[in-house]
Amino acid sequence: MPGPTVVRFTARVVGRVQGVGFRDYVRTRGRRLGLVGTATNMPDGAVVVIAEGGAPACQNLARLLVTGHTPGWTDRVEVVWQRAQGDLADFRRK
């Protein structure tokens, strides 16, 4: 039986998400879900999350970003779904 479909998403998270432990939260949750990716602070105060792995796990992480049960708060989350690229090896905070 084949495993879950592997997907990738990029999420731009806007709100109070820098300096509050948000990237560490995303990295920890992503690793627990078996995902690889990055959580990167942007100059405008947003955080960009790139995650890749099984579709159900990616959907779970994307849902966590939107619900607001994260350090700080989110005003807006823009998620773009893509094909997996296979270029990530771990979940890192940048």
UniProtKB/Swiss-Prot annotation:
GO terms for molecular function: acylphosphatase activity. It comes from the Bacteria. Its EC number is 3.6.1.7. It holds the Pfam family Acylphosphatase. Residues 8-94 form the Acylphosphatase-like domain. It is an enzyme of class 3 (hydrolase). It catalyses: an acyl phosphate + H2O = a carboxylate + phosphate + H(+). Keywords: Hydrolase. The keyword Glycosyltransferase does not apply. The active site is at residues 23, 41. Belongs to the acylphosphatase family. PANTHER family: ACYLPHOSPHATASE (PTHR47268:SF4). This is Acylphosphatase. It comes from Frankia alni (strain DSM 45986 / CECT 9034 / ACN14a).
